[in-house]
């Protein structure tokens, strides 16, 4: 495998295309190409766990083809980002609900209720935003209310500390979201993606080329590994359609041949193994 990769990179250096040389200059250590080799192999191996590795690889490259903020907002990449943000905000909301229950419980710091209500309003307002650009602005301007002083001597100190600790956790969630996703403006993010796009395009091409050359070499030497068996099984048992992968005629014959299919350690299966299992299963066709 490493021999194939080294030979491929040597050929690319001899060809001397600007796109490759720019990529190599950006990602090699200067002394050797180990970093580039490791990157290609890592992405190649990861892509092989997907039923349509080519489509997955293209989707990764496509994520960098963002001309403007409007396109960024509509991208699948940004939809995943927004979903993750909303999930974290929901976690924050649940924490605040717990804090309010503690504050209003017997011997609890009820004086904190007003502050917790304001905190909840901050989280709810952030959660209601559907635009990444508007959310970036909102996170930049988040302001927390000062917590009221507790003067009730009957309140348990333990409950005071519990509420304060939960409140700090909530603030931490918001701070982490801001640091992870809003460290720069949407316009700056678009410019960064544009700058990285040529390198990612070249990386995708290198992964594809390596896959082709590696498969050719294994065929020439009559070598097959477990990952190859998965890929060949998928090609035999499925056909690609507009709706994704559907069972081939051969798979349909297996569906009629077997009454039950059992799989060991199902929780450890990957997406390609799931696709193979579904191809010979009758569940999707409504048959038990």
Where on the chain are the PLM-derived regions?
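Conserved ATP-dependent motor core of P-loop NTPases, especially the RecA-like helicase ATPase domain
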Residues: 1-135, 224
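Short, structured coil/loop segments at alpha-helix boundaries
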Residues: 14-20, 75-82, 97-113, 153-156, ...
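Generic detection of intrinsically disordered/low-complexity segments and helix-coil linkers/edges
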Residues: 38-40, 50, 126, 133, ...
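Short coil/turn segments at secondary-structure boundaries
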Residues: 14-24, 54-60, 102-116, 138-142, ...
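Coupling/switch/interface segments within P-loop NTPase motor domains and analogous charged loops
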Residues: 14-28, 34, 41, 117-211
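Conserved helicase NTPase motor core
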Residues: 2, 178, 182-288
């Amino acid at each position: 495998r490493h021999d194939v990769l080294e030979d491929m990179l040597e050929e690319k250096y001899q060809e001397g295309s600007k796109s490759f040389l720019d990529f190599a200059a950006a990602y090699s250590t200067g002394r050797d190409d180990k970093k580039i080799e490791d990157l290609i192999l890592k992405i190649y191996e990861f892509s092989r766990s997907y039923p349509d590795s080519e489509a997955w690889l293209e989707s990764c490259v496509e994520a960098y083809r963002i001309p403007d903020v409007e396109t960024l907002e509509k991208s699948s990449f940004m939809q995943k980002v927004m979903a993750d943000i909303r999930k974290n905000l929901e976690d924050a909301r649940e924490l605040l609900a717990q804090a309010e229950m503690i504050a209003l419980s017997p011997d609890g710091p009820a004086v904190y209720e007003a502050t917790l209500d304001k905190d909840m309003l901050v989280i709810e307002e952030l959660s209601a935003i559907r635009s990444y650009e508007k959310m970036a602005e909102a996170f930049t301007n988040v302001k927390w209310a000062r917590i009221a002083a507790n003067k009730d001597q009957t309140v348990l100190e333990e409950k005071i500390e519990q509420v304060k600790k939960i409140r700090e956790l909530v603030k931490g969630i918001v701070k982490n979201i801001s640091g992870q996703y809003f460290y720069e403006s949407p316009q700056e993010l678009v410019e960064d993606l544009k700058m990285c796009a040529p390198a990612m395009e070249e990386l995708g091409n290198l992964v594809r080329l390596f896959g082709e050359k590696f498969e050719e070499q294994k065929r020439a030497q009559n070598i097959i590994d477990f990952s190859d068996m998965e890929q060949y099984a998928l090609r035999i048992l499925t056909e690609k359609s507009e709706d994704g992968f559907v069972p081939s005629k051969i798979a349909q014959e297996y569906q009629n041949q077997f009454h039950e299919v059992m799989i060991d350690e199902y929780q450890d299966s990957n997406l390609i193994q799931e696709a193979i299992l579904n191809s010979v299963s009758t569940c999707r066709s409504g048959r038990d």
